[in-house]
Design a protein with these regions (language model features):
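Bacterial N-terminal signal peptides that target proteins for export
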Residues: 1-7
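Bacterial N-terminal signal peptides
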Residues: 7-16
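Patatin-like phospholipase
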Residues: 103-106
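Large, well-folded core regions of big proteins
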Residues: 55-58
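Predominantly the C-terminal beta-signal and adjacent terminal strand-loop region
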Residues: 314-318
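An alpha-helical repeat/solenoid feature that recognizes helix-turn-helix modules
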Residues: 21-49, 63-98, 111-212, 220-308, ...
Length: 353
């Protein structure tokens, strides 16, 4: 096993986030304070430029857009998480106003039935998952987001969003693009699991049986090579969803497990930063989850992965402070890169003990 004893996150129950609302002790690795060599002066400069760029891209309605994805709750939520990764909240910090405006945009797109999706959303459960994650983090960092009215709106939207996730789980244990319990894929499922983890951290009740079923589904999607297939039917592994699969098992409180060891090993073989053969498809999505998986694995896994992805992202920053993802756009790529690069700061509750 490649685990050290320093804890980095409060993880949920084995095969469940909320059994009796108790949190087990997690024998994890990275400390809640960044190690001396994790954050460099060069990284600080890169992050500062990226935060400035991202702030400037916010639209008048509080949203961020990307490529063909206008008025998008997923990109907006990720952008706000990136700003919060610097330690700011909706009520304090240099980027507080931008976070508040983004939060208001997300809340304005929260329907009575709990679904968070802008009008143009296609396959809204991805956006719903990221939006619920953002609401959970905002609620956890500020006990509601600042003023009383916003606090009440945030709490109500978060609870309704969690209940929608719970009632749209399908019989296999997963979720897919639309909020109906019909079919499932591992990618959308993992997005919901992380959202539920954040909500649970913020004190929102999450049904144990929902997470039990989700973990079982994710386990059944793992291939013999350690990677994860897209759906339960036979399929090949791909590293971005495999990174997400490993991270989700950690977030479900599974620390020492053959499935995790196999998944971490697969990522080292197939997707290590700087590996020429690693596919660039879904690059930022994949590394968003991969760095979390390695962060949770700790020890030599984190020690090898972190400086490599840090330097790779630094080298890829454009002159204006952004990163580019052709299908989705620079706001998305920059938000994802910032979340990755600021992870050692441990400001977001999901990355704290």
């Amino acid at each position: 096993m490649r685990r050290s004893t320093l804890a980095i996150l409060t993880l949920a129950l084995h095969a469940g986030l909320a059994a009796a609302q108790e949190t087990p002790e997690a024998p994890r690795s990275a400390q809640n304070n960044a190690a001396q060599d994790e954050i460099t002066p060069q990284l600080d400069r890169v992050v500062e430029r990226a935060l400035e760029y991202l702030s400037e891209q916010q639209q008048s309605d509080g949203s961020w857009t990307g490529g063909r994805f206008g008025k998008n709750v997923a990109i907006t939520s990720l952008a706000c998480l990136a700003l919060m990764g610097d330690g700011d909240t909706p009520s304090r910090g240099e980027h507080a106003q931008a976070i508040r405006r983004g939060l208001d945009f997300v809340l304005e797109n929260a329907a009575e039935n709990g679904l968070i999706a802008a009008e143009a959303a296609n396959g809204p459960m991805y956006g719903h998952g990221f939006a619920t994650l953002f609401l959970g983090e905002a609620y956890g960092m500020t006990a509601g987001g600042g003023d009383t009215a916003r606090s009440a709106r945030l709490h109500e939207a978060l609870v309704k969003a969690v209940r929608l996730i719970e009632r749209t789980q399908n019989d296999e244990g997963g979720w897919r693009y639309n909020p109906v319990p019909y079919d499932a894929d591992v990618s959308v499922t993992i997005c919901q699991v992380m959202a539920l983890r954040s909500a649970r951290n913020a004190g929102i009740e999450v049904k144990k049986e929902v997470i039990d079923k989700a973990v079982d589904y994710i386990r059944r999607c793992q291939n013999t090579d350690g990677g994860f297939k897209y759906q339960l039917e036979t399929g090949s592994s791909a590293w971005p969803r495999s990174a997400a699969g490993v991270a989700s098992l950690f977030y479900a409180g599974i620390y020492e497990d053959r499935a995790i060891d196999q998944g971490v090993g697969y990522l080292h073989r197939v997707a290590a930063p700087g590996t020429p053969r690693a596919s660039r498809a879904h690059y930022f999505y994949g590394h968003y989850y991969a760095v979390q998986a390695m962060y949770l694995a700790g020890g030599d896994d984190w020690g090898a992965w972190w400086p490599a992805i840090r330097e790779e992202l630094i080298a890829g920053q454009r002159d204006d402070g952004s990163w580019e993802d052709r299908p989705v756009g620079p706001a998305y790529a920059t938000a994802m890169s910032l979340i990755i690069l600021q992870m050692p700061k441990r400001y977001l509750p999901i990355f704290q003990k």
